[in-house]
Amino acid sequence: MSQLSKVEDEILSQVKRFLKHINSNLPEGMELEFEGFYRRGFFVTKKRYALIEDDTIVAKGLELVRRDWAPIAKKTQRKVLMAILRDGSPEKAREIIREVVGRIRRGDVELDDLVIHTQITRDLSEYKQIGPHVIAAKRSLEKGRRVERGSIVRYIIVKGRGPISQRAFPVEDAEGMGYDPDYYIENQVMAAVSRIMSSLGYSTEDMNSLSSGERQSSLDAFF
């Protein structure tokens, strides 16, 4: 048995003794439960965190567990967290972001990785704030597709001028239109990883250079 395994066994043994002591003093019907043992954790805020157990990320409140983010953002965030929590390497996390940003700028991303899923929670006429999903839903209606309360709208943000919401098109109609790389870099990928990286010491300038593809100094010494 490795030294690390011995330490883990000792910690788990202490946890069990602690639970037994606490539960013996709790009122009937109440019980403190053990949920899991995690070697590393990363807390963005109290209710937004990621933990790792073996090679599995357990997350709460982060983009990778939310449906209304493009897969490219969720996948990148998951890879970044694995680099930090499993490998202990901010440098690797940085290179992951740089590689994804480069692929987006080159147009080397599958359409499915750009699709945003958002649920329609009310009648379209009841929306006061007309977000991208509402515009995409209305365009689907114009094409004769059924859209109602509870429907999931799948859309892409395409290139062009004007507000982002006006450039939201149903995925069925977006083929060949060309996605907006700046939107997917700034509003999806960087939005999903910037708070994580800034918690490791990356500045706004560092993040700007990442999103533009510039080189920057290593933070491997952090770990």
From Swiss-Prot:
Biological processes, Gene Ontology terms: DNA-templated DNA replication
GO MF, any single term: DNA binding
Q: How is its activity regulated?
A: DNA polymerase is inhibited by replication protein A (RPA), while 3'-5' exonuclease activity is not. Polymerase inhibition can be overcome by replication factor C (RFC) and PCNA.
Q: Has keyword Cell membrane?
A: no
| InterPro entries hit by this protein | DNA-dir_DNA_pol_B_multi_dom, DNA/RNA_pol_sf, DNA_pol_B_thumb, DNA_pol_palm_dom_sf, DNA_pol_type-B
- A Pfam match is DNA_pol_B
- SUPFAM superfamilies attached to this UniProt entry: DNA/RNA polymerases
Lineage, top-rank taxon, reads Archaea
Reaction catalysed by this enzyme:
DNA(n) + a 2'-deoxyribonucleoside 5'-triphosphate = DNA(n+1) + diphosphate
In short, the EC number is 2.7.7.7
Is Membrane included in the keywords of this UniProt record? Answer: no
Temperature dependence per UniProt: Optimum temperature for DNA polymerase is 60 degrees Celsius, functional between 60 and 80 degrees Celsius. Exonuclease activity is higher at 70 than 50 degrees Celsius.
Class of enzymatic activity (EC top level): transferase
Keywords, A to Z, come to: DNA replication, DNA-binding, DNA-directed DNA polymerase, Exonuclease, Hydrolase, Nuclease, Nucleotidyltransferase, Transferase
Task performed by this protein: In addition to polymerase activity, this DNA polymerase exhibits 3'-5' exonuclease activity.
> What is its quaternary makeup?
Formed of a complex between PolB1 and PolB2; the exonuclease activity is associated with subunit 1. Probably binds replication protein A (RPA).
State any further remark. In some Methanobacteriaceae the PolB protein is split over 2 genes.
What is the official name of this protein in its record?
A: DNA polymerase PolB subunit 2
